């Protein structure tokens, strides 16, 4: 059985209590998948209080039902910012090349 490793909250720009909630959601809905943060909260540049958190999910496409449950968990969370999810297997190579420099591993 693979062990999941989570990065500490300081790896991305969110509060520790927000990290606890987010990491619990990721462990529940994306077990065994690598998840990366990117964008302003990953780089720390131009972050505002309500800046969204961009997450890239590695692996096979997420089945529709599982994706809906993940979206629901994020919507019902107490996180005060929007979370945008992208699946690395489904994005254009140009977009992937653009985000790769800012990728921060948050779940392994």
Indicate where each model-derived feature is located.
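Short, well-ordered beta-strand segments
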Residues: 54-56
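Catalytic core of pol beta-like nucleotidyltransferases
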Residues: 1-34, 42-49, 58-108
């Amino acid at each position: 059985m693979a062990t999941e490793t989570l990065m500490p909250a300081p790896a991305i720009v969110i509060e520790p209590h927000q990290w606890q909630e987010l990491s619990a959601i990721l462990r529940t809905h994306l077990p065994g998948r690598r998840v990366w943060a990117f964008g302003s909260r990953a780089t720390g540049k131009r972050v505002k209080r309500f800046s969204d958190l961009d997450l890239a999910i590695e692996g096979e496409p997420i089945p529709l039902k599982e994706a809906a449950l993940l979206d629901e968990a994020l919507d019902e969370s107490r996180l005060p910012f929007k979370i945008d999810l992208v699946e690395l297997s489904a994005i254009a190579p140009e977009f992937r090349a653009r985000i790769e420099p800012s990728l921060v591993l948050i779940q392994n």
